[in-house]
């Protein structure tokens, strides 16, 4: 295909999108742009409006099916509304799973004695939801959240820890700042560094910067860390008895980015390819646990406007759904 033909097709697509705009959505589109401070050139606005309307139609269709009992969760428009599916997927990078954590033959049996419900928020282990912005720092938020919980267990004080400290300084152990990283490498950094600053002394900037760690400002430290086998049983034991656990999931689907509430189950989710780090802060079930409507409660880093005030219920005991147990780890503080 020649560049000229490609340009004509792109221009035709924009023009067609402009003609197809639904005037009934004018007010919603204007309100959405205001809410998220969106500003476009005339040509760009035509394209983004078309994408936004397509996403709006998808959300409304999904929610209609939810009202008919065809799925267990709802969706809503949010800050990702003007992105295509491909653009959204490109904004989250695949997280490599070390070979030591990909053994599919871990023993799976019914564990006796574990509670059917846990929510570490109710026991004071979890700091408020934050927003990573355009930086790919999910791994740092997940790591900081797990350390925050263990520091609360040890000291009785809940202190937001510095995500920026992890972004800027853990490149020495393999993380890549806003580009990508893993929580267990962040734990490795804190272990070797013998300290991590608080958010108050090393605030979040949402971009890469030079390492500015000051040992006199250290607010947390860890003794070691544990990488869990990729099996939901091990994750269950850890979340039930240890505290919030860092994990990673396949978050590349439209259903995830527009999630609103309910137990998330995405048939196309991968159990082996993960691209977004989260913090598992509990688990439970809707109705009787024997009915199989079990969920993990995860804390995201996309702000309180996303999901259930920044949280999601994701299907539990569904063959490692979305890879929830594929890259789980937690720090120890003795």
From Swiss-Prot:
GO biological process: proteolysis
Tissue expression per record: Expressed specifically in placenta.
Domain of life: Eukaryota
Signal peptide bounds: 1-17
InterPro entries listed in its UniProt record: Papain-like_cys_pep_sf (IPR038765), Pept_asp_AS (IPR025661), Pept_cys_AS (IPR000169), Pept_his_AS (IPR025660), Peptidase_C1A (IPR013128), Peptidase_C1A_C (IPR000668), Peptidase_C1A_papain-like (IPR039417), Prot_inhib_I29 (IPR013201)
Catalytic-site annotation from UniProt: 138, 276, 300
GO cellular component annotations of the record: lysosome; perinuclear region of cytoplasm
Disulphide connectivity of cysteines: 135-178, 169-211, 269-322
GO MF terms, alphabetically ordered: cysteine-type peptidase activity; endopeptidase activity
Enzyme Commission number: 3.4.22.-
Cellular compartments annotated: Lysosome
CDD domains: Peptidase_C1A
Keywords of the record: Disulfide bond, Glycoprotein, Hydrolase, Lysosome, Protease, Signal, Thiol protease, Zymogen
EC class name: hydrolase
Annotated propeptide span(s): 18-113
Carbohydrate attachment residues: 72, 217, 221, 268
Similarity annotation: Belongs to the peptidase C1 family.
Name of the protein in its database record: Cathepsin J
Lineage, top ranks: Eukaryota, Metazoa, Chordata, Craniata, Vertebrata
């Amino acid at each position: 295909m020649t560049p000229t033909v490609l340009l004509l097709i792109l221009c035709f697509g924009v023009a067609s999108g402009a003609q197809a705009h639904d005037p009934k959505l004018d007010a919603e589109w204007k309100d959405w742009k205001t809410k998220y401070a969106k500003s476009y050139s005339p040509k760009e606005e035509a394209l983004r409006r078309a994408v936004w309307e397509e996403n709006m139609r998808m959300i409304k269709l999904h929610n209609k099916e939810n009202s008919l009992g065809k799925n267990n969760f709802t969706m809503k428009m949010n800050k990702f509304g003007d992105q295509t599916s491909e653009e959204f997927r490109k904004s989250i990078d695949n997280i490599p799973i070390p070979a030591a954590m990909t053994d599919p033959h871990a023993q799976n049996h019914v564990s006796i004695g574990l509670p059917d419900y846990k929510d570490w928020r109710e026991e004071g282990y979890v700091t408020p939801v934050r927003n990573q912005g355009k930086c790919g720092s999910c791994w740092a938020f997940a790591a900081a959240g797990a350390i925050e919980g263990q520091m609360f267990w040890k000291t009785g004080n809940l202190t937001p820890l510095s995500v920026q400290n992890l972004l800027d300084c853990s490149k020495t152990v393999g993380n890549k700042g806003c580009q990508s990283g893993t929580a267990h490498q962040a734990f490795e950094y804190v272990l070797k560094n013998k300290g991590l600053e608080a958010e108050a002394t090393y605030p979040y900037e949402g971009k890469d910067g030079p390492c500015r760690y000051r040992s006199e400002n250290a607010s947390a430290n860890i003794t070691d860390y544990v990488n869990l086998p990729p099996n939901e049983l091990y994750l269950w034991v850890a979340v039930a008895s240890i505290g919030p656990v860092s994990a990673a999931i396949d978050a590349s689907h439209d259903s995830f980015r527009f999630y609103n509430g309910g137990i998330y189950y995405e048939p196309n989710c991968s159990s082996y390819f993960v691209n977004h780090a989260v913090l598992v802060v509990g688990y439970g079930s809707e109705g009787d646990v024997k009915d199989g409507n079990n969920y993990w409660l995860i804390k995201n880093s996309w702000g309180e406007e996303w999901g259930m005030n920044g949280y999601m219920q994701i299907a539990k005991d569904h063959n490692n759904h979305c890879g929830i147990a594929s890259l789980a780890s937690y720090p120890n503080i003795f």
